[in-house]
Amino acid sequence: MKKIILKCKRYKEIDDCKESVCLHGWLMEIISDQFAEELHQTGTNPLSLQTIHDDETVSFILNLLNEKACSEFEPLIMDDALERIKLRTGEQKEFQILEKRVYEMSEKKLSQIFYANDCNNVLKLKIVTPTAFKTNGKYLFFPDIRMMFQNIMRKYNCIFENTEDVDLELL
């Protein structure tokens, strides 16, 4: 699993959620048609995005959850020739890339963090990115809690068990 952070120059006031959606569209345009189709067909998206900004910069954070996503996205994003991100929509349509960083975490290390630490019985879940799910062939932009937990379980299974199966009875 890898996290790629693209730190870019901010020229305009932006909405982090809207820019994440626009970035997702840009990413779907730069990857192969075959992989884009795989992402649309699969139940678990091995990519998650987050956008955060301060007064002068915008950071696009890409979390790549499996080897396939890493092999498809990382060479395109980390290519030295990629100096700007040009979006079709959004408040700021062009972002000059100031810095690129990659962080890698092995499944073993994530397991250690996940299982070795004492955990509270109560967790606070803060959703900081747009949340939409495809169900019955349509996108649902305001999902219910069951769909959100199903997605979390699928991502867990994708990372640790190499399967997308979820125990629906558990939900």
Q: Where in the sequence are the language-model features?
A:
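RNA-interacting cores
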Residues: M1-L171
